[in-house]
Each structure stands twice: as structure tokens, then as C-alpha cells.
């Protein structure tokens, strides 16, 4: 039984899908005007884990994450670079796939784009106007916020409280300061589309509502995104979607916490803005992912090199213990009476599932993984090992790896199994037999230069990535 924290109700709830065995999930994606920063990477990783765990529990997950390819930031970037908005969007969509692919984020079921849904957006807005929920004014179209009775229910703010901070900017023609834009009148030199309201382009909030409706229907199971999107973006999505669809927009709302850099808010003005495109050249993407899930998704996370190094060390411990188990598999036998280890492994797996069932607590799931590694390290020191126990260890390691999306071997691990490396190890073994220790040391140093560390053990030579 999976429970998750629902921002809408401010409490944990048992997950009950609309359709048995299926999860319809919409995650707000990036505005594709630049490479993604690590703040964008966090929801991509966290909700990828949520998806993976649902799939592990037997659900079919329809995972939709959009690209915002029409936006003020894109238009500004196109003017700066003297390139078209579609050209810039294509470049950074490709970069996004490359970056999150490096972080082992699975491809979405669908990645809808605003430009591909322009006719749908225009019709959606027209429907809202026809029903009295929206109005045209000065070439713009606004949503009539006070007409929607549930406005403020996600952010838990009354409409009167919201009114206090609202204002009408110069050039806006709103009936009420709380009303928000559905359609923006075209400005000279900006990309625009023809519509019944005149030339223009959609507002940000309406884009997600329409893409979610088109891809997943009037009501979805889970809508997710960063905490910064809770208001006004997700609040406005609810208002326009439920006014249009006459149905709840999403049954569960999930929001991940912020990322700070050395205990400061990440911002360009502070010079601590970290792009994934840059950081994965310095930090192993697997380590970055492991670091991101080492904290519960709803909690803020502090990024600094010391904490990343701690994550690297922790992941290395897990991988080294798995390598030891793989090596012992070569000499394991079918001995019996090792039920104690089987029971302990099962207990760790049960604990992993328990904490993941409790609002996807990856921090505690990693603790369970450490405990599995500790038990594995103890087991390989036994005089005799059982094939059954070894296989059980390997199976549970693989479950943890698949659910958390962290590979059991580094992306360079295949190099350790390369035919040339194996031949060098064999040659070194032969040199030692022949007492040619100079050659044996030479081969050892050669492999070390490739980050391959050899260790002589009673069970033979084993190697690991340094």
C-alpha cells in the first residue's frame, strides 16, 4: 500500500488510482531556453524514482512531462542570439535529453510541446470565454479568478489574502488584479499565432492545463513539480482546468523541495548557478543522482562538494560490496543451512519497501541499501558460501538499483571487463608464477593508471575502479 503526501490536503494519503493498475502522472518540465540547472534535475530524478517504484509494484505508469517552447525567456533569448524560437527550443530539448539521460532518468511516455498544441490551446481558451470564466480585454484574454470558487485551495490561501498582494501592471486591462493571462496580445517582432482573440501567444499556465488534458484526460492521478510552482502556476492550472473540464484536475499533488548551494539560494546574481551540462563533466552523473535521492524529495537539499564526496564514497561502498558478491558467486556451492542470511536479506528488502511505501522515502531506502552492503561484506568472509544466498543478494541489489535508478557498476565499469584488461591480468598472474615480479608490477601500475586497482586476496586477484 503506497501512501504519498498530497499538497492539496496537506496530509499523507493512501494512493488510489483512477484506473486500477494504472498511474497517470504529469510532471512540469523545463522552459527550453538554456541548459537545465541542478534545480531542474531534482524533480526529473525524484519523480523518475516515483515512477520506477510504481512500476516495481506492478503499475503501468503513463508519465508525461512537457517542454515549454513558447515563453518570454525563449523570446528574449531568440532576440539576443538572433535565432528563431523553434531553433533555440530544439537545441535545448536535445540538450535536456542528453543531460537527464546521463542522470539515468528514463524517457517519458510523452514530452508534449506547446507549439504542437496551439490549436488545442486556442480552443480551450475559447471554451472558457464562452462559459464566462474568461474575457477579452485590449487584445489579451484573462481568467476571471473570482468566478472559480475553489481558487486558493492548493496553496491554502483565501482569495481575500491573495488580493492584498495583487496589482495591475501598466498595459494590463484586467477586471480584477487577481485575474491572470490566458492569451497575450502580440508585440512587434515576437512569435505569434492567429486566434479569434487576435494575433498573440498563450500564457504559461494555460499551456500545461491543455497539454495535460490532451495527453491524460480531464482528471489525472498525480501532478508533480517543484515547490516554486505551487503558486501561482499550479493554482492557476487547477482553476482553468476544473472550470473547463467540470472535474477535479489532479487527485494528488506532489512538490519537491528546493536546492541550496553552500546553504545559499541558487541564483545567477550570487554566481552559484550550476548547470547540469557543466557539473556532470566534473561529478560522476551516477554520484549526482545518488546525492539527489539521499534526501527525502520534500526536504530542501544543500549542494556542496563535501556532501557530494560523501555520496560518492557511499555509492562506492555499495558497488564494492556488490563486486565482492559477484566474485564469490564463482566459488559458491549448494550448501544448506544458510536460512539466517536469507531471512536477513528478506528483512532488508521488506524495510526498503516499507520506507518507499511511505511517501517514497529514498533517504531511508538508501540506508537499507547500506545495510544490505554491510551484510554482504560479512557474508563473503564466511568460509563457505551458498549459491542460493549469493543469488538472493544479487537479486535484491538489482531491485534497489532498478528502483532508485543507480547502476550497480559505473558507466566506465565495462572497461574493467575489457578483453585487453583481462589479458593483462592473466599476463600478470603468469609473470608472478614465473617470479617475474618486475613485469607483474609494471602491469599493475599500467592498470592503475587506467583507474583499475588490483587486490590480491586468498580467493585470487580482484579488481575495482579507483
From Swiss-Prot:
GO terms for cellular component: cytosol
UniProt keyword annotations, A-Z: Aminoacyl-tRNA synthetase, ATP-binding, Cytoplasm, Ligase, Metal-binding, Nucleotide-binding, Protein biosynthesis, Zinc
Sequence motif 'KMSKS' region, location on chain: 265-269
Gene that produces this protein: cysS
Catalytic activity field: tRNA(Cys) + L-cysteine + ATP = L-cysteinyl-tRNA(Cys) + AMP + diphosphate
Matching Pfam families: CysS_C, DALR_2, tRNA-synt_1e
Family to which this protein belongs: Belongs to the class-I aminoacyl-tRNA synthetase family.
Predominant localisation class: cytoplasm
Cofactor: Zn(2+)
Organism listed in the record: Staphylococcus aureus (strain MSSA476)
UniProt protein name: Cysteine--tRNA ligase
Amino acid at each position: 500500500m503506497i501512501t504519498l503526501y498530497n499538497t492539496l490536503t496537506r496530509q499523507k494519503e493512501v494512493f488510489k488510482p483512477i484506473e486500477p493498475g494504472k498511474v497517470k502522472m504529469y510532471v512540469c518540465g523545463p522552459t527550453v531556453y538554456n541548459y537545465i540547472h541542478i534545480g531542474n534535475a531534482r524533480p526529473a530524478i525524484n519523480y523518475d524514482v516515483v515512477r520506477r517504484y510504481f512500476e516495481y509494484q506492478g503499475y503501468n505508469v503513463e508519465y508525461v512531462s512537457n517542454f515549454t517552447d513558447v515563453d518570454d525567456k525563449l523570446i528574449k533569448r531568440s532576440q539576443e542570439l538572433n535565432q528563431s524560437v523553434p531553433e533555440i527550443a530544439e537545441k535545448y530539448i536535445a540538450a535536456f535529453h542528453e543531460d537527464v539521460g546521463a542522470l539515468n532518468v528514463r524517457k517519458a511516455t510523452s514530452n508534449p510541446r506547446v507549439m504542437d498544441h496551439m490549436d488545442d490551446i486556442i480552443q480551450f481558451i475559447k471554451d472558457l470565454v464562452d462559459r464566462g470564466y474568461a474575457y477579452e480585454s485590449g487584445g489579451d484574454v484573462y481568467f476571471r479568478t473570482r468566478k472559480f470558487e475553489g481558487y486558493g485551495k492548493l496553496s491554502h490561501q483565501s482569495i481575500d489574502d491573495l488580493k492584498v498582494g495583487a496589482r495591475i501592471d501598466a498595459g494590463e486591462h484586467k477586471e480584477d488584479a487577481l485575474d491572470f493571462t490566458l492569451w497575450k496580445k502580440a508585440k512587434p517582432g515576437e512569435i505569434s499565432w492567429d486566434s479569434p482573440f487576435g494575433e498573440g501567444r498563450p500564457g504559461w499556465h494555460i499551456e500545461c492545463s491543455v497539454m495535460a488534458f490532451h495527453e491524460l484526460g480531464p482528471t489525472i492521478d498525480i501532478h508533480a513539480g517543484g515547490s516554486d510552482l505551487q503558486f501561482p502556476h499550479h493554482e492557476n492550472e487547477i482553476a482553468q482546468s476544473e472550470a473547463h473540464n467540470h472535474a477535479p484536475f489532479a487527485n494528488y499533488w506532489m512538490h519537491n523541495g528546493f536546492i541550496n548551494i553552500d546553504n545559499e539560494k541558487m541564483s545567477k546574481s550570487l554566481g552559484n548557478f550550476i548547470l547540469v551540462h557543466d557539473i556532470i563533466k566534473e561529478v560522476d552523473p551516477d554520484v549526482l543522482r545518488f546525492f539527489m535521492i539521499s534526501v527525502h524529495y520534500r526536504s530542501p537539499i544543500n549542494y556542496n562538494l563535501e556532501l557530494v564526496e560523501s555520496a560518492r564514497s557511499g555509492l562506492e561502498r555499495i558497488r564494492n560490496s556488490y563486486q565482492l558478491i559477484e566474485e564469490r558467486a564463482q566459488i559458491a556451492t549448494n550448501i544448506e543451512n544458510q536460512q539466517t542470511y536469507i531471512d536477513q536479506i528478506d528483512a532488508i528488502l521488506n524495510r526498503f519497501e516499507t520506507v518507499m511505501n511511505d511517501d517514497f522515502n529514498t533517504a531511508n531506502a538508501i540506508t537499507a541499501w547500506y545495510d544490505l552492503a554491510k551484510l554482504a561484506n560479512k557474508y563473503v568472509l564466511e568460509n563457505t558460501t551458498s549459491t542460493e544466498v549469493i543469488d538472493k543478494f544479487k537479486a535484491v541489489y538489482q531491485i534497489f538499483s532498478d528502483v532508485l535508478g543507480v547502476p550497480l557498476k559505473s558507466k566506465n565499469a565495462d572497461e574493467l571487463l575489457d578483453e585487453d584488461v583481462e589479458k593483462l591480468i592473466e599476463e600478470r598472474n603468469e609473470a608472478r608464477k614465473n617470479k617475474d615480479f618486475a613485469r607483474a608490477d609494471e602491469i599493475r601500475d599500467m592498470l592503475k593508471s587506467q583507474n583499475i586497482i588490483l587486490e590480491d586476496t586468498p580467493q585470487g586477484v580482484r579488481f575495482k575502479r579507483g
